[in-house]
């Protein structure tokens, strides 16, 4: 309690001190730049009183001694001991699936053996299982699949352990002398962070950039934890109806990179306000709400007990199998009672729509914003991992075509292009239903598609697009393509975040050019962050021979003559809803 009071007082002090240090202007012309928090920067000139107090606040919260010149010791969040026991003999295999018969056989076999399907795309299915179960799985598969697999991860406990921050010793040979440009991301985004660090960090950022950021909660989890979010924006007319973009991560607890990525996006939006014309414009024209983890209970559980836990932590009808898949718990086209009724399944959707507490809480918050605060959702980004895909509605069915399909595809291709120009990583763009299916007979051009892992009704993506008529709604599956899966090393946090932040800027550009045509004079190309990676550096993509072949099928053109394609947009109008979707006005 005492430490909580101390933290609270420190944050209040930081908020009061920095209130006069943030830009006060509301015009599109950027006000004086807001300096981001610098945890280890040196000063050649005497510090002003508020600067000294600000640094004291940060030192007190982060535990950085004033005289320390080496990199601070990370928190000791070593891998749980249960990991080596629970996953001692587990491996991850990738199966190449061709045709409906193989897809159905693999789906049935994984259901019979209660296996954990890590990813399923039009090209492959990744499955985690114990080595001693491999013969049983192969015995249930047709001959064509008996040899159609390769190992992705052959030592799962070691891979799990590597994702936790390691305790670092600060010996004389390990000193790190920071440059004056050393900033908070060098520390916070150096490792994955537990919720006990993320929440105070969000509070600190909100207090430091209080002119355009504030901490909110969008709900309460089953175990009673707040679901924290950062709300960013600066309106010249308080209380006016403003378009809103919602960015969420951490629906599935084990997808740590999604949580870090949302935090990275929030950080860059906050710190670049005032110095970036694009970010300043976006925060003055739109409200942004960023939720690093929708599933705080599950996220905490991955740190304390089981790194690969996926669902939330609420009880089910089977006491030994808690948890509901929050991304199958939404009400639109919910089909959990038809597809997956086993509480032990990783995809268990509950016994009724919105049984997943956190999904229900987020939906209530969104509805309250639209009904009582005049909010209009115009963008929704739901970050997941892994597979490097940009998915648009609908998830529940490939036979239902979204009414704004052309616009969704156009912007989706634009997002993929920006990412590729940033770090040279390829993100596929497709319907969310195709993200979990394979074409009939292995023919990618075929129109008849069959699910690998069952229906995916009840997704948040479909709900925001259909129920709230969010114009641009995407589920983005981040890195990688299988080399590490859910266990992406921490050195990829910043490159992945850079990709995602540039994609967010592209979304903002798309919206701005639609909503303010010819008004906002912004050089968007100069605003994108430059990725640290080059084509010659190690890629996170799986590089077996068959995977290299699939890269040839990417349809996003990079020719300069086609650049203007990504900037064109033809508005489509909405009409009354039908039971299964919208009609597009001709």
From Swiss-Prot:
Keyword Metal-binding tagged: yes
Residue numbers spanned by region Disordered: 529-564
Gene3D superfamilies membership: Zn peptidases (3.40.630.10)
Cofactor note: Binds 1 zinc ion per subunit.
Pfam families assigned: Peptidase_M14
Keyword terms, alphabetized: Cell wall biogenesis/degradation, Disulfide bond, Glycoprotein, Metal-binding, Secreted, Signal, Vacuole, Zinc
UniProt-annotated location(s): Vacuole; Secreted
Binding site for Zn(2+): 252, 255, 384
Gene Ontology CC terms, in alphabetical order: extracellular space; vacuole
Residue ranges with Polar residues bias: 534-543
Positions of the Peptidase M14 domain: 191-511
Glycosylation sites per record: 337, 368
Protein task: Inactive carboxypeptidase that may play a role in cell wall organization and biogenesis.
Protein's UniProt name: Inactive metallocarboxypeptidase ecm14
Species of provenance: Emericella nidulans (strain FGSC A4 / ATCC 38163 / CBS 112.46 / NRRL 194 / M139) (Aspergillus nidulans)
Gene from which the chain derives: ecm14
């Amino acid at each position: 309690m005492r430490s909580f009071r101390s933290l609270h007082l420190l944050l209040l002090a930081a908020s009061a001190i920095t209130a006069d240090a943030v830009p006060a202007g509301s015009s599109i012309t950027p006000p004086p730049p807001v300096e981001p928090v610098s945890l280890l920067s040196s000063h050649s000139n005497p510090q002003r009183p508020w600067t000294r107090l600000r640094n004291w606040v940060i030192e007190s919260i982060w535990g950085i001694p004033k005289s320390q010149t080496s990199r601070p010791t990370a928190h000791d969040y070593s891998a749980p001991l249960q990991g080596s026991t629970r996953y001692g003999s587990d491996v991850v295999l990738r199966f190449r699936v061709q045709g409906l018969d193989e897809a159905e056989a693999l789906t049935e076999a994984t259901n019979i053996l209660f296996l954990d399907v890590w990813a399923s795309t039009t090209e492959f299915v990744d499955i985690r299982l114990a080595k001693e179960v491999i013969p049983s799985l192969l015995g249930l598969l047709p001959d064509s699949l008996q040899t159609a697999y390769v190992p992705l991860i052959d030592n799962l406990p070691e891979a799990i352990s590597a994702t936790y921050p390691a305790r670092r010793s600060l010996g004389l040979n390990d000193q790190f002398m920071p440059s004056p440009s050393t900033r908070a991301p060098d520390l916070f985004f150096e490792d994955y962070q537990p919720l006990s660090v993320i929440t105070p960090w969000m509070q600190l950022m909100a207090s430091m950039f209080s002119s355009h950021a504030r901490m909110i909660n969008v709900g309460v989890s089953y175990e009673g934890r707040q679901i924290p979010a950062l709300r960013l924006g600066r309106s010249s007319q308080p209380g006016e109806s403003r378009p809103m973009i919602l960015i969420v991560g951490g629906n599935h607890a084990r997808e740590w990179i999604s949580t870090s990525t949302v935090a990275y996006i929030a950080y860059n939006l906050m710190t670049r306000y005032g110095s970036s014309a694009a970010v300043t414009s976006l925060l003055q024209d739109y409200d942004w709400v960023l939720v690093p983890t929708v599933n705080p209970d599950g996220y905490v559980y991955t740190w304390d007990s089981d790194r690969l836990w996926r669902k939330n932590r609420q009880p089910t009808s089977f006491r030994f199998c808690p948890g509901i898949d929050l991304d199958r718990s939404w009400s639109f086209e919910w089909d959990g009672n038809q597809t997956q009724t086993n509480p032990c399944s990783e995809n268990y959707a509950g016994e009724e729509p919105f049984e997943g507490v956190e999904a229900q809480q987020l939906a209530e918050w969104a509805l309250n914003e639209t009904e009582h605060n005049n909010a209009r959702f115009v963008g929704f980004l739901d970050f997941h991992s892994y597979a490097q895909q940009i998915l648009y509605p609908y998830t529940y069915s490939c036979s239902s075509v979204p009414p704004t399909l052309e616009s969704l595809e156009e912007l989706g291709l634009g997002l993929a292009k920006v990412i590729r120009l940033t770090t040279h990583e390829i993100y596929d763009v497709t319907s969310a239903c195709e993200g979990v299916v394979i074409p009939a007979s292995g023919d990618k051009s075929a129109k008849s598609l069959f699910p690998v892992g069952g229906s995916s009704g009840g997704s948040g993506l479909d709900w925001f697009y259909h129920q709230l008529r969010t114009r641009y709604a995407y589920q983005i599956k981040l890195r990688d393509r299988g080399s590490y899966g859910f266990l992406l090393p921490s050195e990829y946090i910043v490159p992945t975040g850079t990709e995602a932040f540039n994609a967010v800027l592209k979304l903002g550009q798309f919206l701005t050019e639609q909503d303010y045509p010819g008004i906002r004079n912004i050089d968007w190309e100069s605003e994108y962050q430059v990725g640290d990676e080059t084509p010659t550096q190690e890629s996170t993509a799986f590089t077996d021979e068959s995977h290299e072949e699939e890269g040839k099928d990417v349809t996003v053109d990079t020719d300069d003559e086609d650049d203007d394609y990504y900037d064109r947009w033809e508005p489509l109008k909405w009409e009354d809803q039908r039971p299964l979707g919208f009609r597009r006005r001709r």
